[in-house]
Amino acid sequence: MQIYLGITICLVAFLTVIDCAIPYYRTHSNFGSLGRRKVRQVQRDLTYRWPNNTVPYYVGNVTSTIKKSVRLAIEELQAWTCIRFQNVNEKYSDGDSVRIVDLGSCSSPIGRQQIGTQDVSLTKNCWGMGTAIHELMHAIGIEHTQSRSDRNRYLDILAQNIDNRDLPNFELLSPRLWANLVPYDYGSVMHYSADSFSNKDDEQTMLPKDRSFIETMGSMIPNFYDFDQINQYYQCYDSCRNAGQLANCANGGIPNPNNCQVCNCPMGYGGDLCDQRPEGCGSTLVATDRWQKQKLSVRFSRNDDQYFTFCNSWIVGPSDRTLQVIYEITSDSIRRQICSFGCYEGGIEVKHLQDPRITNDRDCCLNTPLNLTTTVNPLPVILYTSGATVTYDFSYRYV
């Protein structure tokens, strides 16, 4: 048995979430080698928003690695939203501010607390940019996805696998106090993993109603709806309503509030108008009425330290036809290496669902072929990794 470090979320105090660093274990089961990672919603009370969409912050006693995680997270949030992080010094006294500090946990209050300086804590076990974005999203007012008032439509909670002291972490938010601005997304960076707070090794505490999403929950990849709800909550899209030229976005894209002539694009789509395959590795595969086979791979780039390398491919066919794909990972040893709740070491996402914005079911564990039929065309196929070279055998055709 290999032992790794992961994070858990412990709800403490008022509107504060702590992600406590603890060990987790990768073990074998009939589902595969599943990692154990203990680790959105917005308040209707707008006083928790940061004035002028600006968060003053300064960095305290953290390592250079954490500083890089914070820098990358801020760059990502500022690229997708109108939120601005203003770097100030520790003597800042013109209002509320955020201090990035290591308090031995991954934690943040929810929204602006109006107490002067509030802490966002990141420690060495808070993994990369994904966790930094998670905590900064808490700081600007975003709660956990699985706490939404409509959660029970999407999850089954297995209370028998949760200690009584941990059950408050699964309480629902009041719809009177908290608003759901976007659809429920299992792949949100704000969603718990399937085994969060489990009191038994290799036992789930929550199961998606659609079981194919069990590996998707617990993602370290911020998705389209994560940024979209920030933009709605902070009314970022208002800047584009009066714009002279507005991008005509395809495939579910929305004009970027920082530049209304280009689009924020869902994963798997790129270009200024979301009508192109994203730049970088990957290829466009043209389907015929006969099965074709192709190996699709992603190799980690050291330039993507603290995050992931992505390769985006498209499968295209005639507009009036349905696409069929069959895929499976080529190496069982790599499968065992990357298999985890959250697929945070690598995996694949085939965007076959009709909503191009939502996270589809990701795979990093199954050792049998997956078979999909979809009218989505072109069909995005996203491979990603945080280290290992991941390769899938792909068969495809149209019918």
Swiss-Prot record:
Q: What is its main location?
A: secreted
Q: Is the keyword 4Fe-4S in the record?
A: no
Q: Could you tell me which InterPro entries the record lists for this protein?
A: Astacin-like_dom (IPR034035), MetalloPept_cat_dom_sf (IPR024079), Metallopeptidase_nem (IPR017050), Peptidase_M12A (IPR001506), Peptidase_Metallo (IPR006026)
A Pfam family this protein belongs to?
Astacin
Documented EC number(s): 3.4.24.-
KW Transferase (keyword) present: no
The family database entries (CDD domains) matched by this protein are listed as: ZnMc_astacin_like
UniProt cofactor(s)? Zn(2+)
Any one GO molecular function term: zinc ion binding
Report the co-factor binding details: Binds 1 zinc ion per subunit.
The protein's role, per its UniProt record: Metalloprotease.
Full protein name: Zinc metalloproteinase nas-25
